[in-house]
Each structure stands twice: as structure tokens, then as C-alpha cells.
Amino acid sequence: MSTSVFNRRWATLLLESLTRHGVRHICIAPGSRSTPLTLSAADNHALICHTHFDERGLGHLALGLAKASREPVAIIVTSGTAAANLYPAIIEAGLTGERLVVLTADRPPELIDCGANQAIRQHALYASHPTLALDLPRPTPDIPATWLVSSVDSAMARLTHGALHINCPFAEPLYGADDGTAYQDWLMTLGDWWNSREPWLREMRQSTLVVQPDWPQWRQKRGVVLAGRVSAEQGARLAAWANELGWPLIGDVLSQSGQPLPCADIWLAHPEAASLLRQAEIVLQFGGSLTGKRLLQWQEQCQPQEFWLIDDLPGRLDPAHHRGRRLVADVGEWLSAHPADKQTPWADLLVDIADRTQRQVDAHLASHFGEAQLAQRIPALLPPDGQLFVGNSLVVRLIDALAQLPQGYPVYGNRGASGIDGLISTLAGVQRATAKATLGIVGDLSALYDLNALALLRQSPAPLVLIVVNNNGGQIFSLLPTPVAQREAFYCMPQNVEFGHAAAMFGLNYVRAESWEQLADTVSDCWTQGGVTLLEVVVEPKDGAETLNELVAQVAAWTH
């Protein structure tokens, strides 16, 4: 038997099986042990191949592709620590639901735990974070092709969210001429399957939406709607639905609901707002991953008669552990099955408080160029028919608290584990999936953490602006009660860098904006001229955190 040739046949069948389940994008890192998978992917015309030299970034590239395409995305890496570097992306996918198919090449069993090079224990490498795992045997024609395709089909049919880890051991030799006629009899046992686009094994799973029988009674009550991480279409529908009910909707930065009560993370500090919201008899939360500190505090402390959380991800998504109902359902389908009944708004005072807060924010930031002003004015920078990617740490909190994003405008972020790793890589994946003009915004430490992902931006299919807010360190810790004496050295960790050389190294356009006017003009030019621009905005380190705290204190002190 020619081991290298049969390895290719095995890998070819494996990848072809994945395409029958909607896999179009595959992300590949360089490696020798993964050669059968890589060459088979390159030969499969149904696959779009993406490459990156850093597996950690590669995983997040796949995450972004899956996030924006809403399709399963495959990843190929070689054995050893290459596979371990995918861990952060797998964790994030497990928390936010993107489907990743992780193909880790491995040494055969006789090379494990014996000192062989680049051989680690890859069984259960990612512990409980993948939704599913499939440990394949060493390729051999003694195993029927029908076993391989049906094993993949069964796993993919059950992959409704999160990652599927498929560990793929390959024995040497890995290279050699491919005899196109060898082992065709093994493949041809699948007959006319090769001429179809269907899986070999079609597992049918029916999940029927459960309509809440008492909804007609509850929709007559005083309700509050919390909108967390939902899609753009769902966010727009949710806003219209809540408005029909006459219920206040408090929208997160990732809700894409238009945030009809803007600046919620500021006005929730107002005593009258808190008092009014305590009158809610039912709270409905759609989607998880709420961002704002005061919104999270209110969500934790609220005590309605009923608390329902609706999301298509399974499991508990309520860290406050409310007594109530956890409804696993597509948000759009749930709204259709639970129509609104037009009611008179019961909490109009919140509209007045939110409007007053927004005016206060506008006035406070009108003439002060800095991180807070940039966050508040992000809507003015958005490309028409484009999308926004928001980083983590301080920047997402400022945008959540200060900006009012357009209803139905696509907004992406990694708010599962909320790490600062892989943000630029995820941004690259989001844009490749949609080919839309894209505005991204991250902090300086986030940019440093994923600096080599700037290489991925060189292949952007549409105009892209990456704003790096350089506040010289992790200034999110200025919002937290970290010990002042140790804050700078052990928490914020300022690096005193500028990003012009990084942009030049990867051949990207670079602008350092010194004023709002320069920043806005630069972004506008980028949308018309195209290309990729790294736009650095150097701000006072504590500007964003201090401004947010000042505004919260001002609103909390209002007497009427």
C-alpha cells in the first residue's frame, strides 16, 4: 500500500463530506503532517482556501468567517502546539455559537508518548470546549469509505453551534506522486454519491418551537425588553415588536436594535429610571453577552414576576440565575410565534431621561477630541451598506454607553469570552465573508496582541479602516477599583508605541489623526478611494474612563 496516496484519498473523502454540509471556507496553516488535508483542500473546487502563518490568528480568521457567513468554517493545522494555538477561537465559538470544524493533523498512535518530535496528546486537546469531537483512526483501506462519510455526516448533523474537533492521524510518508488510479475502488464503493451534493447519511432532527400558552396574558403586563447579541435582522424586528407592545427596549451595542433608549449604561444610574424599571412585571431578554456595567447590575437585581431569556444557543445564559424560563429558539421565529398586541407605552419617562442623557453626552463631548468623543461619534464614520467590528476592553464599553448605532446595521464583536486576542484576525474573517466596506476599532494592546494579523488585511476585498485607539495601555483597568499604586505597572502596562512602522511593514496605508475633523475626513476618503488604512488615534490615557465616570456621576445626581 502507498501510504501517501491513501492518505490523500482519505483526506479527499473527509473534505468532500464537509462540503456536503455547507462548508465553503477553509483556513489553512503551514505544516507537514497536515499535507494530505492541505493538498486535498487545494484540489477541491467547492472550497475557498484562506491561509495564515499563525494558528492563533488562523482560528480567529475562521471565527470571523463563520460569524458573518453563518456557515460552518473548517480549519486545517498540523500537529503539536500548532493545534493548541486554536484554543482561544474554539472557546469563543463555544460561547457565541459559530460553527468551526477543526481538523488537527496528528502523529499515528505509535509516535505518541515516546519522545517523537512534534507529537503531543491531542485526544480531548480542547477539553469540554468543543461541542463535539471525532477521533479518526489511522487511514487504511480496511476501513470502509462508508464509515468515514457517515461518521462525518453524523457529527455535522449534530453540530448546531460551537466547534467540532476532528483529530486526523497520518503516518509517513506524507509526500510523493499521486497515482490517480490507486484506491479508486475504495472511493467508488460510494457509487453515485460522487455525482450528488447530498450527505451520505442524512440525519433529520426536528425541533418544534414551543409557543408559550400564557403569552396573551403576559403581553398585557408591564414589560421590559433587553436586547443582547442578536443578528441585524433580529435586532430591527425586535425594536418594532417592543415598540408595538409599548415596552421599553434597552439595547446592547451588539443588538443592532437602534438602541431606542440611547446611552442606557449612563441613564441607568439615574434614581428615577431605576425606580420606574422596578415596576416591570416581566422582563424578556433576547440574546446574551450584555456589555454595560449598569445594565448588567440592573439585570442582576431586577425582580419581575417572570424572567424569560430567548436565544438559539442552549444552556444557561443568565449569570444572575433568575427564576423564570430559558427558551431555546431562533429569535425571529419566536417573535413570529408570539405577536405583539399594541399597547400604550407604560414607561414614557424613560424616553425623556434617555433623551436628556444623550443631550448631556453631546454637550460634554462637543469640543473635546479624545477616546470618548470618538466612541460617541462612531455612527458618523460608518460606511454606507457596510459593517462595524468592535474590539473589547474599554472601547466596546464606551461605544455601548455613548453611541447610538443605526437600527439593522451589522455590528460584530467577540463578546463570548471577551478576550483581546485575535480581534484583527476576526475582523479580517468578517470582511472576507461579506466583502463589505468595514470599519474596525480596537485598542492599542489589542492591536499589539494580534499585530501579525495585519498581514491578513492585505487581502481585503473591500475598503477597510482599522482605527487603533492608542491610550497607552489597558485603560479598562482605570474603570475598575485596581490599586492605584500598582495600576500602571501591573494592570495598564503602557507600551509607548506607535503603529506607523507596523502599517509600513505590512504595506498598509497609515494616518495618525490629531483632530476629529482630520479623522472624519480620512475615513470618508477611505470609503471613496478604497484600500486598507490603519488609522491611529493617540489619546490621553485616562480620557475615556474618566469621561464615562464623570457622565455617570452627573446623571446619577440629577434631582428631576
Curated annotation (Swiss-Prot):
Top-tier EC class: transferase
A GO molecular-function annotation: 2-succinyl-5-enolpyruvyl-6-hydroxy-3-cyclohexene-1-carboxylic-acid synthase activity
Summary of subunit composition and partner proteins: Homodimer.
UniProt catalytic activity: isochorismate + 2-oxoglutarate + H(+) = 5-enolpyruvoyl-6-hydroxy-2-succinyl-cyclohex-3-ene-1-carboxylate + CO2
GO biological process: menaquinone biosynthetic process
Swiss-Prot/TrEMBL cofactor(s): Mg(2+); Mn(2+); thiamine diphosphate
EC number(s) given by UniProt: 2.2.1.9
Biological role stated in the UniProt entry: Catalyzes the thiamine diphosphate-dependent decarboxylation of 2-oxoglutarate and the subsequent addition of the resulting succinic semialdehyde-thiamine pyrophosphate anion to isochorismate to yield 2-succinyl-5-enolpyruvyl-6-hydroxy-3-cyclohexene-1-carboxylate (SEPHCHC).
Protein name: 2-succinyl-5-enolpyruvyl-6-hydroxy-3-cyclohexene-1-carboxylate synthase
Matches recorded under InterPro entries: DHS-like_NAD/FAD-binding_dom, MenaQ_synth_MenD, MenD_middle, THDP-binding, Thiamin_PyroP_enz_TPP-bd_dom, TPP_enzyme_TPP-bd
HAMAP family: MenD
SUPFAM superfamilies with a match to the protein in the record: DHS-like NAD/FAD-binding domain, Thiamin diphosphate-binding fold (THDP-binding)
Family stated for the protein in its record: Belongs to the TPP enzyme family. MenD subfamily.
Protein source organism: Pectobacterium atrosepticum (strain SCRI 1043 / ATCC BAA-672) (Erwinia carotovora subsp. atroseptica)
Coiled coil: none
Domain of life: Bacteria
Pathway, per record: Quinol/quinone metabolism; 1,4-dihydroxy-2-naphthoate biosynthesis; 1,4-dihydroxy-2-naphthoate from chorismate: step 2/7; Quinol/quinone metabolism; menaquinone biosynthesis
Cofactor notes: Binds 1 thiamine pyrophosphate per subunit.
Annotated keywords: Magnesium, Manganese, Menaquinone biosynthesis, Metal-binding, Thiamine pyrophosphate, Transferase
